Amino acid sequence: MASRMCEAIVAGMQGENRSRVGRGGVAVVLKHLAAQGEAVGGRNGQSAIIGTHDLHEIHLPPVVAGVRAGALGFMAAYNDIDSVPCCASPWLLQEYLRGELGFDGIVMADGLAVDRLVGMAGSIPASGRAALLAGVDVSLWDEGFASLERYADDEAVVAAVDRSLRRVLELKAMFGLLPEGYNAGCDRVPLGSNERIGVGRGSIALPKAEAITEAIAHTREESCTLAGECLTLLDGAEQWSRIGACLRDDQAGSIIVTGPFADDMACFLGDYTAPLEQTQITSVYRQLRERFGERVLLAVDGTGLDGADWLNAAAVVAVLGGTSERSYDSAFADNGAAAAVAEHGATCGEGVDLCDVTLPWRQDALLDRVRELTDAPLVSVVVSGRAHVLTHVLETSDATLWEGYAGQYGPQAVVDALVGETGMPGRLPVTLPAYAGAVPVRYNDRQSAEHVYRDAEEPEIGRAHV
């Protein structure tokens, strides 16, 4: 699946065989190279202790697919693989990536990853030298590359700088970013094509306004479709039709929307997302309110409503989970993490690691409170980018819907499913643990985790479907 996704994003942004490079396309830098998802303890940028077999069988096939698709860049990861940092690994960045796979683009390091080598290299300049000689062409935010003048008499460093500079200039030339007549040293031929891309054209081919308008409309349509395809019903199929009927029945009573994300949209968007216009912002609560008017009541933390509102409720929709929302002016640590995360800020995303994968902010307790207040059917909608323990949610709710990060049309997709207008065709992209201590659990574990723990007969709630 990861390999097919790599192929799709490269073809979509660069064109098949790089056909859109310099013609309105965007160069792709695939990340992260490699095995960053295997970090010890699930901690961002930590060591990946894996054998050669697992490295090649699990983590490198997407790299192969990306190179074959014509990706113009790769980003070396923060982590080390068996004690060798990825951005200081000549085997990974040169022998394997370029020598074995034939990659001809640029390699860049992740943010501050070069300077993180100081413990191994002994100094910031030495860190820059180690990364450069290993095969890193471009650094991000580092001081190490900016300190390479110290090695002006080092022939190996000078040769590596020339080599990396040529790669960067060739890439810029492919996109017409060099002055007219400038020659980067050689032309580049797109993979699978006999057409030569001129070097130093001094112009960028941009799509016409009509094409942009058409692409935006197509993207919105596809995004709406994908949001619906994210929906995965974890439990309560036998109750779903009855709940939908209660929602649609104007005489059935109020609809109460609760949970930390009841009136939130950012939770659907994932990590590193651009701000939305005010007119684009919606939520599950607002979508329900648009359809059913004043019947829909909001109680984010389970308070603020009269007891009669709860007793007369037709249904309760709890929007739970986590979020990758972070401030756009966040400072970042040397592992890419937001330096400060508010109490109700990001619980997922790059550098946002959790040692407790139960739902944050006492969301299980919120469901208990709701059950004390009403006997109305309770639907829990889980919006999350990580695998949380949902054991209590499943036990407490009449139905549980997993949504993941469905994008800006996520709230609409949830409500469409709630009222029975659409199906829920999704499949889990992750394996959900039944207990926090059962992690890691994987869909491709070679041995089943069933009946292994003395204190947990079944440590998994649901398995990924790939």
Which role does the model predict for each range below?
Residues 1-463:
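Glycoside hydrolase catalytic-domain context in secreted enzymes
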